[in-house]
Every structure is written in C-alpha cells, then in structure tokens.
Amino acid sequence: MKGFDVAGSQRISDEATLRTFPKVELHRHLEGTFELTTLHNMAMRNGLDLPKDMAEFKKAVQFPKDSEPDFLKFLSKFRVDWYRTLDDIYDIAYASVLDMANDGIFYIELRFSPEHFALQNDFDRKVITKLVVRAANEAAAEAGIYVRFLITFNRMKQTPKEMIELYEDVKSLKQDEIVGVDLAGDETNYP
C-alpha cells in the first residue's frame, strides 16, 4: 500500500524526523565529509584559487549528481592543498564529527589518511594521526557519541614500504580507538 511500510505504519518522509533516528556509520572517509560552508571558509582563508561565490565553489569541488560515473574524476575532488595548518586539520575533524552527530549518528568508524592531510606541508604523520583522533574524540564527547578510527593507506600516493612504515608508526601510538586499516584510491591503475 502506497505511503506505508511493511509493518503498516505510515512512512516517514520528513527529513528532520529522519535526522532524529539513531544511526551507525561504518564507512565514512574524513577527507570527503566536510560541510560545504566549512570547506569554503577554509579555502578562502588559505587563499586557494577557487570561486568565492558559493554556487560556483560548489560546482568546483563537488562531483555533479547528474554526471556519468567516473571514479577518477570523483577522486580528483579530494585535494591535498586545503590544509595549510594543523589547526585546519583539527577544525575539519572536529566539525565533521559534530555534523555527523547532528545527523543522528551515534557510532562512527571514521577512516582517514594521515598521508592525505600531511602531503602538502610535509606534516609528521604521527602528529596528524594524534591530532585527528583528539579532535574527533573531543567532538564526540561533546555530542555524546562514539567514534573509532581506521587508518587509510592510499595506493596512489604511498608505496607499499611507506604504508608499512605508517602502520608501524600508528601502531606505536597505542591508541585503542584506532581499530583497523583501510586501502583506498585508484584500484584500476594501482592494484
């Protein structure tokens, strides 16, 4: 029957109501979870060559919904030059977790690549890892939610040797919130 779910209750079509439902997020990449206004503010603050107008900015940084699927074009939107300071990285991690909490997510497994955040400025990968974990944990505590982490290795930007070194570095941090690793990037050209 149209408008009803299997149990016979009326379907909920109100987005605000859906946001209140408790949710679990098991596969969220920090690098792709930024709220557009936060990203725009950071781009303008850091003098990136991107449109100041929000509508044009959105076109420049988001994958168009009506486009043909193109994995490499999609990956090209994940720029490494957004982050000029450690504060930028802290702010993004903190704001992203609060945004997820506002969507009703109470448990998150957040993936992030220390390499992605470190590449532009050659930040120390262990410092990045500790910073992201701290920022996300502080936001999670504020929002009353849980967050765990997976460290992402990027097959396009890291050699196997670099991945193993990063793994050993992260393991040496002894942060129990880091529960796994992930392999991401262009699977076709970098199997």
Segments predicted by a language model, with ranges:
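Metal-cofactor-binding active-site regions of metalloenzymes
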Residues: 2-191
